[in-house]
Amino acid sequence: MIFGYARVSTAEQKLETQIELLKQQGCEKIYTDIASGVREDRKGLNEMLSFLREGDMVIVYKTDRIFRSLKNMIELIEFFNQKGVFFKSIS
């Protein structure tokens, strides 16, 4: 399955552009969060991670939408690798 993940930092920002781009990439299910990237309690991201299975793909608009830091990027990429999940950033 192809999953998308979109995040904005504040309610004033719009998710629609990211969601539209993810749909154009073939995302079947898109998870979203409205929260600062430094927060760890991103419910949409955590829910998506719990559903991932081998062969799935995660697509984001930009890497800063999913990764909070270099350390977090390494941890999530390792998680994807262990699960056999592919990762793609549109930009």
Tell me the role of every PLM-derived stretch.
Residues 1-91:
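Short, structured surface patches at the beginning of a domain
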